């Protein structure tokens, strides 16, 4: 499953630059709703946090991981974190008032799954996998002003291929997300997504050959490609000054649930040694300027 579809900073920007309609403070409510503040031109967001995740895809053991954040926009070109990687939207937003916007650009991510920090002693006997380097593209469209003047519904698809020879596979991840501000300081976003993988990816992370079976005692298993997972994520952020338009410090939190399906669920690394239900929890602090 794609951990976060779309830029957290983009959701923060779209959710908070129009916050006067939701503000409870009378003075703020009277402010110009088109005042984009720090988001009117080039802007950057950096942050650091931490979280917990499964020790491998399908594991029921959890490990700590760092959660750095880097997002921004230069000349209308948005860029930022996409899971353990980066993306760029090469379609500049020339008309900020438009209700329909298109997204298209490159992405890459690093996938260190089963490369280390494997907590399960039996799965560890299967050996380590190489770190995958995946490159591809993201395509999408977003629609603003659906339920209120400042919300946003985004539909997108990521497609990526391993170019490092780790799994030599392909992933396709469609998603839909809805974001809205709750005030000038608070925003939230809900996303639903799924991931389809090819046979090379499934074979690398979920198959067990005769050598692996002899080493671990797990039964042999031949995994096929297909829909690997589906899930949902809930993201929230709070600007500590009370108005995100002025930039500065903020805090964020993220909860992701993913359900493995198909051969990813049936594989012994999941069905016998792990759990098809996967959780990711993260939080941290950010600074926008």
Locate predicted features.
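Cleavable N-terminal export/targeting peptides
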Residues: 1-40
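Short loop/turn motifs that connect adjacent beta-strands in outer-membrane beta-barrel proteins
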Residues: 24-25, 30-43, 58, 77-102, ...
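Outer-membrane beta-barrel translocator domains and adjoining extracellular loop/strand segments
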Residues: 34, 58-62, 116-123, 167-172, ...
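Residues that define the transmembrane beta-barrel architecture of outer-membrane proteins
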Residues: 42, 62-68, 100, 129-135, ...
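Transmembrane beta-strands of outer-membrane beta-barrel proteins
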Residues: 42-48, 68, 79, 102-106, ...
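Transmembrane beta-strand segments that form the barrel wall of outer-membrane beta-barrel proteins
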Residues: 46-54, 78-88, 120-124, 152-163
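Residues on the lipid-exposed face of transmembrane beta-strands in outer-membrane beta-barrel proteins
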Residues: 48-52, 68-74, 86-92, 106, ...
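Outer-membrane beta-barrel transmembrane domain signature
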Residues: 141-145, 162-250, 257-265, 287-289
């Amino acid at each position: 499953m794609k951990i976060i579809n779309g830029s957290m900073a983009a959701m923060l920007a779209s959710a908070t630059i129009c916050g006067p309609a939701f503000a409870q403070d009378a003075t703020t409510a009277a402010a110009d709703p088109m005042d984009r503040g720090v988001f009117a031109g080039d802007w950057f967001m950096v942050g650091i946090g931490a979280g917990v995740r499964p020790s491998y895809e399908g594991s029921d053991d959890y490990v700590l991981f760092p959660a750095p954040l880097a997002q921004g926009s230069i000349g209308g070109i948005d860029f930022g974190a996409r899971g353990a990687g980066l993306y760029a939207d090469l379609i500049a937003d020339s008309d900020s008032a438009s209700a329909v916007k298109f997204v298209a650009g490159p992405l890459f991510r690093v996938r260190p799954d089963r490369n280390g920090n494997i907590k399960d002693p039996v799965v560890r006997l299967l050996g380590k996998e190489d770190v995958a380097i995946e490159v591809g593209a993201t395509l999408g469209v977003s629609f603003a002003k659906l339920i209120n003047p400042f919300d946003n519904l985004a539909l997108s698809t990521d497609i990526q291929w391993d170019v490092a020879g780790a799994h030599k596979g392909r992933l396709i991840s469609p998603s839909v997300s809805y974001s809205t501000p709750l005030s000038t300081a608070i925003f939230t976003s809900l996303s639903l997504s799924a991931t389809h993988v090819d046979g090379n990816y499934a074979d690398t992370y979920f198959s067990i050959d005769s050598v692996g079976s002899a080493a671990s005692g797990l039964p042999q298993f031949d995994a096929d490609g297909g829909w690997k997972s589906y899930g949902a994520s809930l993201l929230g952020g709070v600007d500590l000054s009370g108005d995100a338009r002025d930039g500065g410090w903020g805090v964020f939190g993220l909860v992701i649930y993913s359900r493995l399906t198909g051969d990813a669920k049936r594989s012994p690394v999941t069905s016998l040694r792990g759990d098809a239900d996967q959780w990711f929890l993260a939080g941290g602090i950010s600074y926008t300027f």
